[in-house]
Each structure stands twice: as C-alpha cells, then as structure tokens.
Amino acid sequence: MQSFDIESLIGVNKVPSLVEMVAASRASSFSPPFEQQHHDPMGVVAAAAAAAAAGRHHPYDNRDDGQMRRYRTAFSREQIGRLEREFAKENYVSRKTRGELAAELNLPEGTIKVWFQNRRMKDKRQRVGGLAWPFPPQMAAYMLNPFAYEMWMKTAAASQFGATGPGNGAYGNNGSSTSPSAAGSLPFLPPLGFPSFLSQNSTKSPSSPHSDDSSKSKNTSSDDDESKPVNFSNSPSSSSPSPYSTD
C-alpha cells in the first residue's frame, strides 16, 4: 500500500528554483516571433505589399500619370494667321491681349503664351543667322552641312573684305570675283579646313596698283637707258673748245 506524506495531501505549492525561472523566461521570449513567422504568413505578405506601395508613390509627388503627359496643340490655319499678325505688332503680349486672343481663338491662355515664347525663339534664331526665311534652295542645301554655317560666315566675311579692297573682287588681288551671294550658293564646300586662297591672302599685304605701275615704269625706263647708245655729239663737252687747240 502506497503511503502519502502530509505535504502531498495538503497540496502545498512548490516554490520554483532560480534555474527554472530563467529557463521559463527564455522560452517565453523566443517562442512568439517563431510562431508568428510560421503561423501568420499573411501578415508578412501584407507588410511587404505596404512597403512596395510606399516606395512607388513619392510623398512629395501628388501628380497623376495623366497630368505628366504633354500633348502638342494642333493649330488651325486661321489661328496661326491671327497669332502671326499679333506677333508682327508686338513680340510680347500683355495678359489682357492674351485673354482676348484666348477668347477669340478658343484656346487656353497658357497655350498662347507658349506659342509666343516659341515664336520669339524662332525669330531670334533667324536674326542670328542673318538670313531671311524661307531660305533659297541652294542655301537650304548648304545649311544641311553640319559645318556649313561657320564656313558660310567665314566666306561672307572674306568676300566683304575683298569687295572693299583695292582689287574690287570678292577676295582681293587673287583674280577671283566670287560675290557673297555666289559664295552662299555653293552648297558643297569642304566642311573642314579653310580655303587656300584665303590663307594666302591673309599672309600677303594688299598693295596699291599705282605703286606696281610706277615700279614697272621705273624698271622699263632704266632698261631703256642702259640699252640706248650714248651720243657724244650733243654733249656739252663736244661743243666747248678744247684747251689744246692751236686756233
């Protein structure tokens, strides 16, 4: 027959030791994350989706994708004609005039403002190029060359210098008579380098045609004097009496 002591019968709780308390605390601290990771996969998926959504939408970018797209406005012929006439009057339109044009042409004021900005830039490019629009066919073909603009400016400057020089030609005294208009109509000049006749003219100083003629006349007169025989009959020594004469 099994015997029981008084403590087991009364049911006095046993006080846990220090080792048991530390082991229990460690088990309670490590078990919840492990159980949550293996038994709650939807929470991890939801957290990843939220992080991806936060990275896709910038907090300072409130614009939609449709607002970021810009479409080119197709102007009608009447609208372009009206805008061109207004641009001929004044390059910079006031807000009042812009509002009147917007109401007349059924266009937004922002579109009219952008059109005038682009038109001013186009006019500035034409003024810098120094050419009237539209270009002649030869000049248009010449301007297709990447280096054509620089070469055309150099040729035009050299031709203007030669036209005011003593030779009255396009390039001075070299005998060439190319005018600025003819120089601009040469669409296939070499893109690199500088014309050889221009470099030759830059090293030579322009000389006056009168000086050349005078030097030539001096040379010819000296040659004639050397080749002409000396006539002693008309010299003053022959007409004077000789000191040894007996008369």
Swiss-Prot record:
The keyword Lipid biosynthesis does not apply. Transmembrane segments: none annotated. It is found in: Nucleus. Residues 194-247 are annotated as: Disordered. One of its GO terms (molecular function) is DNA-binding transcription factor activity, RNA polymerase II-specific. The keyword Protein transport does not apply. Its main location: nucleus. It comes from the Eukaryota. InterPro entries: Even-skipped_HD (IPR052002), HD (IPR001356), Homeobox_CS (IPR017970), Homeodomain-like_sf (IPR009057). One of its GO terms (cellular component) is nucleus. GO terms for biological process: cell fate specification; negative regulation of transcription by RNA polymerase II; regulation of transcription by RNA polymerase II. Residues 68-127 bind DNA. Belongs to the even-skipped homeobox family. PANTHER family: SEGMENTATION PROTEIN EVEN-SKIPPED (PTHR46294:SF4). Transcription factor. Involved in motor neuron fate determination and maintenance, acting as a transcriptional repressor to counteract gene activation by transcription factor unc-3 in a subset of motor neurons. Probably acts by binding to specific promoter elements. Required for posterior-specific pattern formation in the embryo and may have a role in regulating egl-5 expression. This is Homeobox protein vab-7. The lineage of its organism: Eukaryota, Metazoa, Ecdysozoa, Nematoda, Chromadorea. The gene is vab-7.
